[in-house]
């Protein structure tokens, strides 16, 4: 379980493993501190808008939404203050959901889906912890969207060897859920999503 937690905490590695399992994800670019930064290469790979993310940070720390090339370098510099590894992803536009999965009595159960509607530009720290978002449980989704998201969340849980409770976050693009990240240590406060599910 420790190595699984480390894998899911490392956004880049987790998404690489998920992609190999056939789970759709955003286009992404890896960048390490000290490497030559090619703004053109980043733009060509992920386009704009995009997200610059500290690779190993939680609660949306070190995450910046970038709309054009002139904003990219400052966002990279800020994100490097959080981690020396970055993940730069194309910004997916669509409905955002989170799916809880848990193992109970030797059976894997998928919890009701929660849709996240952020008042901010994305589900950032303020939206998560300062009430700047609305969570709708159960999410009002077309049946086929719900089925595909639940299937993917369960597949990730089983094939990655997750234990306890996990929360997989997706954004729908053209009716297809794209994985954003997996949280294997989800919050359990009254404001947290898993207790609502």
Residues covered by each model-derived region:
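Glycine-rich phosphate/pyrophosphate-binding beta-alpha loops
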Residues: 60, 116-119, 183-196
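Active-site nucleotide/adenylate-binding loops and adjacent lid/helix of ATP-dependent enzymes
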Residues: 6-95, 150
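Conserved metal-phosphate-binding beta-hairpin within the catalytic cores
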Residues: 90, 100, 157-189
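Residue-level marker of alpha-helix boundaries and capping positions
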Residues: 4-5, 66, 144, 185
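Phosphate-binding site of ATP-dependent enzymes
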Residues: 67-151, 172-178
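Active-site anion/phosphate-binding pocket segments in diverse small-molecule metabolic enzymes
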Residues: 112-114, 152-163
């Amino acid at each position: 379980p420790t190595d699984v937690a480390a894998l899911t905490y490392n956004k880049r590695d987790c998404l690489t493993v998920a992609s190999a399992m056939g789970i759709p994800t955003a286009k992404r670019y890896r960048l390490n501190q000290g490497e030559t930064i090619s703004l053109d290469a980043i733009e060509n790979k992920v386009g704009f808008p995009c997200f610059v993310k500290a690779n190993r940070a939680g609660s949306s720390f070190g995450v910046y939404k970038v709309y054009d090339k002139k904003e990219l370098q400052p966002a990279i510099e800020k994100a490097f203050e959080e981690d020396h590894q970055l993940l730069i992803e194309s910004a997916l536009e669509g409905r955002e959901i989170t799916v809880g999965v848990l193992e109970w009595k030797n059976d894997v159960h998928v919890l009701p889906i929660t849709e996240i509607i952020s008042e901010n530009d994305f589900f950032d720290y303020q939206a998560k912890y300062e009430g700047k978002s609305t969570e709708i449980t159960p999410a009002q989704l077309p049946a086929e969207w719900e089925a595909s998201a639940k299937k993917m969340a369960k597949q990730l849980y089983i094939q990655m060897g997750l234990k306890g409770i996990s929360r997989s976050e997706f954004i729908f693009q053209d009716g297809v859920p794209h994985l954003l990240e997996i949280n294997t240590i989800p919050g359990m406060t009254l404001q947290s999503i898993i207790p609502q599910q």
